[in-house]
Amino acid sequence: EELRRILNSKNEAIVILNNYFKGGVGKSKLSTMFAYLTDKFNLKVLMIDKDLQATLTKDLAKTFKVELPRVNFYEGLKNGNLASSIVHLTDNLDLIPGTFDLMLLPKLTRSWTFENESRLLATLLAPLKSDYDLIIIDTVPTPSVYTNNAIVASDYVMIPLQAEEESTNNIQNYISYLIDLQEQFNPGLDMIGFVPYLVDTDSATIKSNLEELYKQHKEDNLVFQNIIKRSNKVSTWSKNGITEHKGYDKKVLSMYENVFFEMLERIIQLENEKE
């Protein structure tokens, strides 16, 4: 209800980026699960797959019927209009599918100013925002024109990371990258927080790293209390689509639900601080 009030007062979508500069942190799966849950909870959402590999699109296609858009994502960016690049998955859920043609984007924007290049997606999303409650962007795990575009177009960034040494050290670099773009082009950008992704739940090293992560961010409370643990169920869903009636379905789904609701709670808190 509180979220509904905030969305009504904004009259336009809240844009969330799900991103980190490292693959294998469960990023696209998190986006897929959020798409599934937003649909389930009657939020009107546009998912944007700004990834050449189109991982999110392929994953969503296992659960929803995904058709090809009239105009692919790259052509939409090139033409300056994304309306024809949107496909409808359900009454609530829309998608701009990823396409390998996105690899042509750096060539298209090569002669542009850095500002115009970085603002491209933000500019083209502006007229679509009033149609949705949330817009969730999934993009490549590397510094690139794709990521810059996504960061500049977003209100919030959510950072999935593996609870292991290496990831925690890279956090600072990633945050500096965000701050750099925020200061130049997107002063309203905020971090929702880090979602820990555990590959091996029994490893003592990972447990101590996770504790360390919570300790480091005790003051700013940036680490989600709810975490994602790797599960075979998710691999099954990636093959056959998301189900809710088979063994362990509910348990794994509720793990994602908890993260989803914590994300919404954090957004509500941040939005209220702005008012």
Question: Where are the model-predicted features located?
Answer:
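P-loop NTP-binding core
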Residues: E1-E275
